[in-house]
From Swiss-Prot:
Function statement: DNA-dependent RNA polymerase catalyzes the transcription of DNA into RNA using the four ribonucleoside triphosphates as substrates.
A GO cellular component annotation in the UniProt record: DNA-directed RNA polymerase complex
Keywords annotated in UniProt: DNA-directed RNA polymerase, Nucleotidyltransferase, Transcription, Transferase
Record-linked InterPro entries: DNA-dir_RNA_pol_bsu_ext_1_sf, DNA-dir_RNA_pol_bsu_external_1, DNA-dir_RNA_pol_su2, DNA-dir_RNAP_su2_dom, DNA-dir_RNAP_su2_hyb_sf, RNA_pol_bsu_bac, RNA_pol_bsu_CS, RNA_pol_bsu_protrusion
Annotated family: Belongs to the RNA polymerase beta chain family.
Molecular function (Gene Ontology), one example: DNA-directed RNA polymerase activity
Biological process according to GO: DNA-templated transcription
EC number: 2.7.7.6
Keyword Coiled coil assigned: no
Family annotation (Pfam families): RNA_pol_Rpb2_1, RNA_pol_Rpb2_2, RNA_pol_Rpb2_3, RNA_pol_Rpb2_45, RNA_pol_Rpb2_6, RNA_pol_Rpb2_7
Record-given protein name: DNA-directed RNA polymerase subunit beta
PANTHER family per UniProt: DNA-DIRECTED RNA POLYMERASE I SUBUNIT 2
Top-tier EC class: transferase
Amino acid sequence: MAYSYFEKKRIRKDFGKSVQVMEYPFLLSIQLDSFRKFIDTDPTGETGLEAAFRSIFPIKAYSGSSELQYVSYRLGEPLFDVKECQIRGVTYSAPLRVKLRLVVYDKEAAAGTVKDIKEQEVYMGEIPLMTDNGTFVINGTERVIVSQLHRSPGVFFDHDKGKTHSSGKVLYNARVIPYRGSWLDFEFDPKDNLFVRIDRRRKLPASIILRALEYSTEEILAMFYDTTDYTIKGDKLIMDLIPERLRGETAIFDISIKKGEVLVESGRRITARHIRALSKAKLEKLEVPADYIVGRVLSKAYIDKSTGEVIAEANAIITLELLAELSQAGHKVLSTLYMNEFDVGSYMSDTLRVDSSTNKLEALVEVYRMMRPGEPPTKDAAEGLFSNLFFASERYDLSTVGRMKFNRRVGNADDVGTGILSKEDIISVMKTLIGIRDGKGEVDDIDHLGNRRIRSVGEMAENQFRVGLVRVERAVRERLSLGDLDAIMPQDLINAKPISAAVKEFFGSSQLSQFMDQNNPLSEVTHKRRISALGPGGLTRERAGFEVRDVHPTHYGRVCPIETPEGPNIGLINSLSCYARTNDFGFLETPYRKVIDGLVTDEIDYLSAIEEGNFVIAQANAERNDSNKLVQDLVNCRHRNEFILKASAEVQYMDVSPQQIISVAASLIPFLEHDDANRALMGSNMQRQAVPTLRVDKPLVGTGMEKVVAVDSGVTAVAKRGGVVSYVDASRIVVKVNENEMHAGEAGIDIYNLTKYTRSNQNTCINQRPVCRMGEPVVRGDVLADGPSTDMGELALGQNMRIAFMPWNGYNFEDSMLLSERVAIEDRFTTIHIQELTCIARDTKLGSEEITADIPNVGESALSKLDEAGVVYIGAEVNGGDILVGKVTPKGETQLTPEEKLLRAIFGEKAADVKDSSLRVPNSVKGTIIDVQIFTRDGVEKDARAVEIEQMQLKEVKKDLGDELSILEDGIYARTKKLLLSAGLNESDLTSMSRDKWLTQNLADEGQQAELEQIAEQFDNIKEDFDKKFEVKRRKITQGDDLQPGVLKIVKVYLAVKRHIQPGDKMAGRHGNKGVISNVVPVEDMPYDQFGVPVDIVLNPLGVPSRMNIGQILETHLGMACRGIGEKINRMLEAQQEIHKLRNFIQEVYNVGESRQVVDVASFSDDEVLRLAGNLRAGLPIATPAFDGAAEKEIKELFVLADMPQSGQFVLTDGRTGREFERPVTVGYMYMLKLNHLVDDKMHARSTGSYSLVTQQPLGGKAQFGGQRFGEMEVWALEAYGAAYTLQEMLTVKSDDVNGRTKMYKNLVDGDHRMEPGIPESFNVLLKEIRSLGINIELDKD
């Protein structure tokens, strides 16, 4: 492959064997595409805002005299950009303006005659916008809307697994789930009657629904049963014979084919052989005894023709008496229902007998009573309720997905249809359910991903927006009906508040709108690709069973089987697989390569879980020859969710990649195939907790996925267009764009402003550093600047550490780690944490608070770090308790003593009226002030510091725009010069005059003069545009801020804290091998090898075998080989060997193994080879993709190239004694992460502090500055030791004896170390509780 200039700087050697047929899809597309569908105008009106508007509008008045129609909508421009919103603490959103048309009809004229039409654009609130990185900025904080995996609308058939009834009988049920509306359930009871429930209420016989749909008993029976006719001849019955229907019956008489030839004797069971013989004999009639018809059911009602009296109702059971009666009434043919024990049950027939209703009205009344118990039913109310349940599009919608699923399940040919149910739909559900009960068909697997779909941001926002619109609709309808429409405009009808409230509620406080996990780029990407089964309309932790949480065969390639949280949410929160995407219906799809007659093509099809089951799919590692044909006769395949062996000619599809089944986080684990799944799960989860280190270090052993994550996460600055870097400093990069990528009349310059030392949601540091230099060429997609945890455009979550697996004085007992002091000194795991501290000046009843440096009773030293406005300087180093922002609050006037009044009169001292309420640094925090932001209310005078900050921001904006303008000017003057030279002016004339006079020259040629004037006009327009741009920015910066009521000023101070690695910090590898640092040992005491190189970390070898994460050992060996190769290249560079030797060695390294990667070092220039070698000095970075990684043989080859022992084990010497250890030790390089569980955040001690109000016991937890609970078991321990006084102290003065503890505090101050324990407050609480039971206990204080 061809590498760009930037990519040639450092090439990661790839051990992957299988050819990559497709790039990884953009990792955030699930979020961005969904939201784009929501806000883009959809001409079909099926999705997004358009669909919401069309579903509610037009809104008609109750009288029909007017209606409000929807025309179109547009989203305005957001007021502030993303960064400004984050700084100001506001929502990044755009105003929604909707064009509405009010149509008033003429009451007097014919129906539909329009009297008046008014059209107007109406403001309908703000719609939060998604940033380019798939997040939302809500009230200044970045949030992510997690996609939800919910049960797809449609119809589902299931059974209770025999758990409902004591007999263990399996009871089948069907459930019609709409996208919105009432649920309709059908279920069998233990007696095999069919019942219906609406919205899980009381059950009714299922026939009631059919009666309510105007079906009679006869029609119902005709729909569900075939009939068998019997002709009465005297005292004999002749049956119309269909041989198939006799299967399984026991003959109660001899069945003969011909005279004397008995086929089935009486008492024998009729088998398939008998039926074949009957069919062969073509017997159409069979004489049966009268007993044979007894117990059968009539399919229709029979009437006595002479009297008109009903002899037998439809569904009546035939008895001998009834038979005689019917025969007597002259009925010669009786039609009975065909039923048998095996495949046609008597369920509907039995249900009709249970049903008390006989006509439509009775059925509707029953439904009404069930839905609205206690309300008296009327005919209209009952009919209205029933038709609104399933047959009104306003109340009920299956959605396109639901209709497609419904039709496919009940066997309808079409995939499309209406969103409401029809009579036929309800009948087909009942027929399918009865079929399943009869053994025809299977129940559904609700955990199959064909029955669960993804609801993403756009869809959820649309639903919420529709909820807001429905609230508005009611108000509009009432307003329209009030009359006086002549003076009313659409604006007067619409109140945007309910819409804004619904949208705000969803984005601000929905369970699926989550505070973004911003620890590092991986945690951001993973959070956006998360799929939750929880949330509104989903499952709850308590109700979810094992099946829902389990890995399902359909997860393959769609949902990661590894990455899920440990704990109560296991299996309910999942992560999208690398290549998965959602289709138009919201079902997850995964890509497959098409295979035709054993030949693997490059054609790629995306299949959903529903479609996949029908195909035979081979795995990505199936052996193929050079012509891409499958080699083996039998190939390992998946078919109908089972793993089987199939002939290569039968294979229809093949996986696109071995990494297809896992998520992004799991695909970052090298040698994943050698790790136990539980540990891989921990590894995936812990990578998300890694804190970005101060000095980034790319992993030596990676998987090739690092680059994809770093670029797609959006933390790096990526070139939008190709060009040449014309300017670089720490905070901005300017790229002069290639001419072929420029648009007509534009600047041809891209400015990238980098994010510097910004606080993330998790208080970690977001900082971008340029990786390009001036004059370097860039192509589109190149990384220009690294973000947090990225190194030259690759994800770098931790550091490559030299580790040894050996015990060391018990310091690595039970997963502890021993660390070398060198790691701390070199700042390898030093991290920066930024805290935001806020000081708010409010308007109080006693007067307004003031931010000032004039604080009462505070010494000069405490104010030394504040400026004259009372705000701390940037760059000041502060400790716990230091004042950051001086603030005074007025306090209520106290009654003064005469002496104080006199002093006040003499000295005029007023300072006593205010109290110090300054913002101070929290205890145990020490850091540097890196930024201050001041927000002042409109109309409040700005202080000197606020003005200074404003000036600085304006200067930056000016510089940006000035750079862009100067480059544009240069381009325009270059074009002008070319034109003037071609018009005959010479170069010396042009250089002697100022450039702005070039544009005012008079040229002889009219065409050239016109062109010059056009250039001059273009130049004036550009200047004007820039002035406008600057004015807009200036207004934004200088305008007052929109603060909450009562707030005058807000000062935000950003404090950077450096955290060095220390004992108690948690660290981990990528294989779930986590541990806590037990000790940091001087470097001279660490074990070292024969070259005197000490190890950085000593790990316990016993942590490996039982955990079965062998991947870490392979990573250690491979890391060592990579490091060895880097050292060899370093030696060659230092010895200044010939370039061809260096080139050959590097080529030899890249040629190791049978990988898909081709690196032609021969085609590199000498400078490029030297640059590459310089970047390989620290070690050769390699990629070993999951399930497709480096083999043992290849690792050994690298060891040989690096001149190292192939065992990967080395003889180490003890740094303390100087003696060699007995056995060689596994030493190598492992990528270690420092997790965001730092001892500084956990360590906490309390002497005195706040107490709980009722029990008066100290609070718990660091956040509340609480104490350590001395619990029940600790009390037992002291009791066991007989330490009575210690126990008394613990239970009284150190806990909730209020008087005792106050007295002890006084005594300690006085130097008196005695205590006087009293009655603990909890004892008083106990007394009060006993009194509440009516038992009085009094204490005698003798």
